[in-house]
């Protein structure tokens, strides 16, 4: 059993105090040189101070009800013959309309949610074990890429077949193997093998064959001492947009995506963590992703100019830049959403293991989302993350001011874009937007609960009671706050994030405790602990 003290307490970075403690900049590992005005007159990062009791001001009965209803939606999504959850459902839980497709991420989310349902007393230990055994047995039978052990992105949840025709519109699908989706599936295997010993052998039989080195391109950034992960690959030639190769040298060449994941504050870092922990990817890869893009005019398509300093870790120059928002410096994600920033933190206790980087940035990301929703946009509610679109479809929701995407992860139905400009290079196109019908996504507020528990809880209570965005399967996926339009469906991943957050806050970090056993703690904790982000409260 992993001692919970090894995980530590999440940190809040909203006090104007000086960060004390041990200096992590060991000789040979970290060096720094200033660049831009920020380096000369920058505020020191705000401290990471221990959070107050994680359940202060929260009614446990309400949490239990939310968890029970959320679990009911996942049960309704899951095909009883295969144990595979659909991507989403609509309609009553007694006769749900399942999507006809699922992914490794969805399957992983269902499995870790099963453990949490057991921990909360919603299901028995025997039911937990039976459900996990059924799902894992099905996974062992699914077609997958044998040389790497990776799974395809889309399967039919009713029979386990690889999806080649999209159920919603009949379009052709080229079966794809995603690095990030396989990352979430592997993360779930790592949780359940420790949380439920009765399925450890089955889980390990799948996990032991998954090699994330298949995605690692050591030459992705010429002149940099480490590489990046591809978005994924096809094992049969797609229509276009690929480069051939095979980084493992095992089996025939595959068709890699042209893109790599090159941004730090985004969800693919879960695949990086697992690959590093298992010795499949070099640790220096962690520092090859960019915290923010450079502050030169070549990058002036960014919606604001970053400020920061350069530091060197493991021989790699890292621009420790940040965006400025409401008196804070925040290392941005691509879209300014809660999912990219905080979902990996459900598994890796980033805030406590890396108090000078994630420990500051996560808390400020949550604060920025809250202040944006309540103070800037004046929506009256907060929590923004990719989810269903009220009225139909799917939209990447976020807080544009803390995201790098020039088109913005929008926060309202009108797709209002923020653009502060890039000082010295171009003026802003919309530095002071007028916000419209804001869309909040409940799973984002649940992710925030580990950093602002009472505020997140109260926000969710309002979403349920005032916006009526709640059904028999828990919170609906999204709601527009002015029109009251609700996306009345449940997405399996979003429901799994809800239960993942509840599990960590109310079940003694159950996801983290089981994920970090073994190689994760010994490899990832010292690696991420040496870094200092450019994040902090401006003083």
Segments from the language model and where they lie:
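N-terminal secretory signal peptides
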Residues: 1-13, 23-32, 36-38
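C-terminal segment of N-terminal export signals and the immediately downstream linker at the start
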Residues: 11-12, 32-58
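Ser/Thr/Asn(+Pro)-rich, low-complexity disordered segments
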Residues: 47-539
